[in-house]
UniProtKB/Swiss-Prot annotation:
Domain PAS: 107-177, 262-332
GO-annotated biological processes: circadian regulation of gene expression; DNA damage response; negative regulation of DNA-templated transcription; negative regulation of nuclear receptor-mediated glucocorticoid signaling pathway; positive regulation of DNA-templated transcription; positive regulation of NF-kappaB transcription factor activity; proteasome-mediated ubiquitin-dependent protein catabolic process; protein acetylation
UniProt-annotated stretches for the region Disordered: 392-411, 420-494, 620-653, 755-803, 822-865
Protein name: Circadian locomoter output cycles protein kaput
Lineage of source species: Eukaryota, Metazoa, Chordata, Craniata, Vertebrata
SUPFAM superfamilies on file: HLH, helix-loop-helix DNA-binding domain, PYP-like sensor domain (PAS domain)
Sequence positions bearing Phosphothreonine: 451, 461
Interaction with SIRT1 as annotated region, ranges: 450-570
Cellular component, GO annotation: chromatoid body; CLOCK-BMAL transcription complex; cytosol; nucleus; transcription regulator complex
Predominant place of localization: cytoplasm
UniProt GO molecular function: chromatin DNA binding; DNA binding; DNA-binding transcription factor activity; DNA-binding transcription factor activity, RNA polymerase II-specific; E-box binding; histone acetyltransferase activity; protein dimerization activity; RNA polymerase II cis-regulatory region sequence-specific DNA binding
Organism: Spalax judaei (Judean Mountains blind mole rat)
Positions bearing Phosphoserine: 38, 42, 408, 427, 431
């Protein structure tokens, strides 16, 4: 008993120990799991923060168009920081340490302010006169762009009378520069002289004006300047010349006007597209000025409100601005020309304004004018003015700018053919110095003592040896057009000489490889343009030829240049044996071309064989035709045999192919006062019998059932076409007669008698010549009784063995040619079997009365035309 109790106690203790151990392990696992979760959260937070910082750093780096990985972002950041450190060290080395330089101004800002205060500009000249650098402030003083002066000779802008003096000043320092020492550069390198410099103009034809300038500076050795900066001249010196400049001396001078200007143009535009907004009254007074205006024009809003805008405009621009104002008041919106605006600092800035008139929302009256002013540079203004004058801007030379390659400015614009020809004519492209040499060589030499400030050129100066640009362009246009007109092929005649001349173009010694390759590119672009224009011209020629062909076909159809046959056949197996033409004078028959009828071509030899066969048909058609070229009257009669070997006679005046399309309407038109078509139900046995004629109006539709035979009279109005189109549902024979216009002397109504008979299939072909005589007599009797057509009886309708179509026309005493066309085409007997022939005729008669009731009108109500 005790043993069992002790065993139970021991087992309970063991179980308790096991459970405690298990609980401890579970708690330890929970703690580790919680630590792991918290560590993962902190790690994820750190990674997210790191990614955010990397992304922000990558967005600040330049050229971040594509997604960069972390290593690339860090590498670019390191490169940027290293470069920034070098630039900072260089700027600290060249920092102005004097006390008179304000600490809150950078070197560039201080230099710009000093140049504006001195009315001068910086000029760096080599001892041979080559200009390697010029500051942008030269624009406000001499109206030259820096690109006009850089890499040119200073003697191109100095009168010839002062060349020797300036050259002597520079050459003396050149001789002494062989033994350059730091002591010499500190003591004897001062340079000061005065001379005249050429003022720039928008129009080169204007008389040249010289300004009296003062040069103050010193000489500097280029090898003593840090190679990375060259004191700001790094981007200006060409790489091809940089090695030769390393051991030479340049003169850095401040060039000032001897007589300062009180008001001058702003020399630089930091942000050319900077803009501000203002509102004006209809009298052009300021009503509003936004917050962007004061940094640009210097005026605060309250300083200009109520004042007129014309108070701030240059006097030379007032006329153009007044015209722009009138245009605005007329059209309600527009864009102004380039004009000069006077700032508060007494400087002129160039602006261009987009404006529009706003209207009151209730009464729609003009309220005020909203203007958006944009700052533009003088280079844009000069280029626009020269384009208006028809002067092409000279291409800038291959000069390197700061942070850019040396050839970045030497891009050739190949937009138009004219510019390409202009470049090709001037190839090899002259350098800027040669252009300036020609510019200054035609100016007269003036005495500096006589005109201390400005020297206008003499008007008697001989003109330049070369023609102006617009005259050259006119000559090139005339020669170019004459060459293109005289050549057989547009493309080869223009492209081959140009390409061959470009291929054989020698490369001058002073011309860089880049310029030559650019000219070759221009020639290739010219070739592509000419080839494209050639393809366009050829396409236009083909299209015009196609349109002309269609017009000729329509004219032949409308004005009766030939007889056109339009055929509607119910059975596609219908064959035409031959076509016979008979005329009063067989010598007048010309060559005939094949006739295309519903996809089947009747060749000329078949027509001629039909002409020689001389078969006689069972029906005749009389047609009067007026000829535009013949002066004699010809009358011919034409007959065609119909049967298993059918023949059609056709008179044609043209040699073009006649096409027979399908139509489902019937049109009989002529310029006569009126025409009538009589369609009897069947041919009577003798012509003495009488029948009633049903007449219906012009605007009512004729409806014929399949296989139905009717007696109708159709009155039609004159229409300017000559075609008869037969519907497929009419069993009146498958012949379409086309006739041209008639003479205006035809005054009376004309009647067409159309008679149908169903051909007899069992009748042999040998009996047809025997039936010719009674049928001709029957036709003559019908022509005499045209006003009334006899109507056969029911027995005659059922016993009619043959069906044919006869069309007759009244002939008038007209001097024009008369053609007689007769054709007969039997219906296909395979449509109805012989055993059911009588039954089908009775069904046709039963449907006759119903169609007359629905479709035909009372003949008493119709007046013949």
């Amino acid at each position: 008993m005790l043993f069992t109790v002790s065993c139970s106690k021991m087992s309970s203790i063991v179980d308790r120990d096991d459970s405690s151990i298990f609980d401890g392990l579970v708690e330890e696992d929970d703690k580790n799991k919680a630590k792991r979760v918290s560590r993962n959260k902190s790690e994820k937070k750190r990674r997210d923060q790191f990614n955010v910082l990397i992304k922000e750093l990558g967005s600040m780096l330049p050229g971040n168009a594509r997604e960069m990985d972390k290593s690339t972002v860090l590498q670019k950041s390191i490169d940027f920081l290293r470069k920034h450190k070098e630039i900072t060290a260089q700027s600290d080395a060249s920092e102005i340490r004097q006390d008179w330089k304000p600490t809150f101004l950078s070197n560039e800002e201080f230099t710009q302010l000093m140049l504006e205060a001195l009315d001068g500009f910086f000029l760096a000249i080599m001892t041979d006169g080559s200009i390697i650098y010029v500051s942008e402030s030269v624009t406000s003083l001499l109206e030259h762009l820096p690109s006009d002066l850089v890499d040119q000779s200073v003697f191109n802008f100095i009168p010839e009378g002062e060349h020797s003096e300036v050259y002597k000043i520079l050459s003396t320092h050149l001789l002494e520069s062989d033994s350059l020492t730091p002591e010499y550069l500190k003591s004897k390198n001062q340079l000061e002289f005065c001379c005249h410099m050429l003022r720039g103009t928008i129009d080169p034809k204007e008389p040249s004006t010289y300004e009296y300038m003062r040069f103050i500076g010193n000489f500097k050795s280029l090898n003593s300047v840090p190679t990375s900066a060259h004191n700001g001249f790094e981007g200006t010196i060409q790489r091809t010349h940089r090695l030769s400049y390393e051991d030479r001396v340049c003169s850095v001078a401040t060039v000032r006007l001897a007589t300062p200007q009180f008001i001058k143009e702003m020399c630089t535009v930091e942000e050319p597209n900077e803009e501000f907004t203002s509102r004006h009254s209809l009298e052009w007074k300021f009503l509003f000025l936004d917050h962007r205006a004061p940094p640009i024009i210097g005026y605060l809003p309250f300083e200009v409100l109520g004042t007129s805008g014309y108070d701030y405009y240059h006097v030379d621009d007032l006329e153009n601005l007044a015209k722009c104002h009138e245009h605005l008041m007329q059209y309600g919106k527009g864009k102004s020309c380039y004009y000069r605006f006077l700032t508060k600092g007494q400087q002129w800035i160039w602006l261009q304004t987009h404006y529009y008139i706003t209207y009151h929302q209730w009464n729609s009256r003009p309220e005020f004018i909203v203007c958006t002013h944009t700052v533009v540079s003088y280079a844009e203004v000069r280029a626009e003015r020269r384009r208006e004058l028809g002067i092409e801007e000279s291409l800038p030379d291959a000069t390197a700018d700061k942070g850019q390659d040396s050839g970045s400015d030497n891009r050739i614009n190949t937009v138009s053919l004219k510019e390409a020809l202009e470049r090709f004519d001037h190839s090899p492209t002259p350098s800027a110095s040669s252009r300036s040499s020609r510019k200054s060589s035609h100016t007269a030499v003036s005495d500096p003592s006589s005109t201390p400030t400005k020297i206008p050129t003499d008007t008697s100066t001989p003109p330049r040896q070369h023609l102006p640009a617009h005259e050259k362009m006119a000559q090139r246009r005339s020669s170019f057009s004459s060459q293109s007109m005289n050549s057989q092929s547009v493309g080869p005649s223009l492209t081959q000489p140009v390409i061959s001349q470009a291929a054989n173009l020698p490369v001058p010694q002073g011309m860089s490889q880049f310029q030559f390759s650019a000219q070759l590119g221009a020639m290739q672009h010219l070739k592509d343009q000419l080839e494209q224009r050639t393809r366009m011209i050829e396409a236009n020629i083909h299209r015009q030829q196609e349109e002309l062909r269609k017009i000729q076909e329509q004219l032949q159809m409308v004005h009766g240049q030939g007889l056109q046959m339009f055929l509607q056949q119910s059975n596609p197996g219908l064959n035409f044996g031959s076509v016979q033409l008979s005329s009063g004078n067989s010598s007048n028959i010309q060559q005939l071309t094949p006739i295309n009828m519903q996809g089947q071509v009747v060749p000329t030899n078949q027509i001629q064989s039909g002409m020689n066969a001389g078969h006689i048909g069972t029906s005749q058609h009389l047609i009067q035709q007026q000829s535009l070229q013949s002066t004699s009257t010809q009358q011919s009669q034409q007959s065609v045999m119909s049967g298993h070997s059918q023949q059609t006679s056709l008179a044609s005046q043209t040699q073009s192919t006649l096409t027979a399309p399908l139509y489902n309407t019937m049109v009989i038109s002529q310029p006569a006062p009126g025409s009538m078509v009589q369609i009897p139900s069947s041919m009577p046995q003798n012509s003495t019998q009488s029948a009633t004629v049903t007449t219906f109006t012009q605007d009512r539709q004729i409806r014929f059932s399949q296989g139905q035979q009717l007696v109708t009279k159709l009155v039609t109005a004159p229409v300017a076409c000559g075609a008869v189109m037969v519907p497929s549902t009419m069993l009146m024979g498958q012949v379409v007669t086309a006739y041209p216009t008639f003479a205006t002397q035809q005054q009376q109504a004309q009647t067409l008698s159309v008679t149908q008979q169903q051909p007899q299939q069992q009748q042999p072909q040998q009996q047809q010549p025997q039936q010719q005589q009674p049928q001709q007599q029957q036709q003559s009797s019908q022509e005499q009784q045209l006003p009334s057509v006899p109507q056969p009886s029911q027995a005659q309708l059922t016993q009619s063995p043959q069906q044919f179509l006869q069309t007759s026309r009244l002939l008038h005493g007209n001097p024009s040619t008369q053609l007689i066309l007769s054709a007969a085409f039997p219906l296909q007997q395979s449509t109805f079997p012989p055993s059911h022939h009588q039954q089908h005729q009775s069904q046709q008669q039963q449907q006759l009365s119903r169609h007359r009731t629905d479709s035909l009108t009372d003949p008493s109500k119709v007046q013949p035309q």
